[in-house]
Amino acid sequence: MSRTIFCTFLQRDAEGQDFQLYPGDTGKRIFNEISKEAWSKWMAKQTMLINEKKLSMMNPDDRKLLEQEMIKFLFEGHEVHIEGYTPPEE
């Protein structure tokens, strides 16, 4: 059975995560406040960041950068800036 939460990112009720996807207090906050739809949007941005900045998840500094960008994107309303990327026109 799906959970409905108020998604901080979307600013509306939406389907919540089935389980905690990220460790620690940040993971608990994501589980309680971020919907599946918002998480999917973050995953696309995360993939772009990893590829364009050539981040390695084995490098603690790269993981820290990714976590900071995730928090800014999901909770603070900041767009992820990727040099040279122009979003497609709608």
From Swiss-Prot:
Keyword Transport: no
Biological processes, Gene Ontology terms: cellular response to oxidative stress
Keyword Iron appears in the UniProt entry: yes
InterPro entries: Fe_traffick_prot_YggX (IPR007457), Fe_traffick_prot_YggX_sf (IPR036766)
GO cellular component labels: cytosol
UniProt GO MF annotations: iron ion binding
Pfam hit, one: Iron_traffic
Entry keyword set: Iron
SUPFAM superfamilies assigned: YggX-like
Gene3D superfamilies for the chain: Fe(II) trafficking protein YggX
Signal peptide range in chain numbering: none
Family to which this protein belongs: Belongs to the Fe(2+)-trafficking protein family.
Function, as annotated: Could be a mediator in iron transactions between iron acquisition and iron-requiring processes, such as synthesis and/or repair of Fe-S clusters in biosynthetic enzymes.
Subunit structure: Monomer.
NCBIfam families named among the record's database cross-references: PRK05408.1
Name of the protein this chain belongs to: Probable Fe(2+)-trafficking protein
Organism the protein comes from: Erwinia tasmaniensis (strain DSM 17950 / CFBP 7177 / CIP 109463 / NCPPB 4357 / Et1/99)
